[in-house]
Regions:
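The feature marks the mature, well-folded catalytic cores of soluble enzymes
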Residues: 1-168
């Protein structure tokens, strides 16, 4: 097998697959958050995990190498410089610009091992987890009823939705 991605058929033999095991991000789904998080129903985490585990087992039994999104991203950010870059990119994409909150989130995330950091980013970061100690700007003082500073990513367990590859 050659390194990299070489996908020339969507109906040929599957050799390797990237999956995400449903986690805490599904617990963020409530009737109030369904529309915002692009879901139609609130899945039951334990059942979703059991179904996922059975699916992954069947894939392995059929010779498919199963790799997990969290593990692969954690490997990619093993270098502390890459962790800093990921956190900065994540905060920018999430439009988190309030200085106090940004500093709190940066400290919160960079004090985790890479795998835990990735899992937390996917689960969504609650305001209560990164309360700013001191307001450094007007933005830090703005109240919001939404419990998350960054949205959870429940759609990630449909791993083909955020990305697909054709060719190499």
């Amino acid at each position: 097998m050659y390194p990299g991605i070489h996908n020339f058929s969507e109906i040929g033999k599957l050799n390797k697959v990237l999956l995400h095991r449903p986690g805490k991000e599904l617990e963020a789904l409530t009737p109030a958050t369904l529309e915002r998080l692009l879901f139609d129903d609130v899945p039951y985490l334990k059942i979703a995990q059991e179904e996922h585990d059975n699916f992954a087992r069947v894939l392995r039994e059929n010779g498919v190498e199963v790799v997990y999104y969290v593990d692969e991203v954690a490997k990619a950010i093993a270098d502390p410089a890459r962790q800093i870059q990921l956190v900065n990119d994540f905060l920018n994409i999430s439009k988190i610009h309030a200085k106090g909150l940004r500093a709190s989130m940066t400290s919160y995330l960079l004090n985790m091992p890479p795998k835990q950091m990735v899992a937390e980013l996917i689960a969504g970061i609650k305001r209560s987890e990164v309360a700013t100690k001191e307001a450094t700007s007007l933005m830090d003082l703005v109240e919001d009823d939404y419990p998350f500073v960054s949205d959870p990513m429940p759609n990630l367990y449909f791993t083909r939705d955020p990305g697909a590859c054709v060719g190499n």
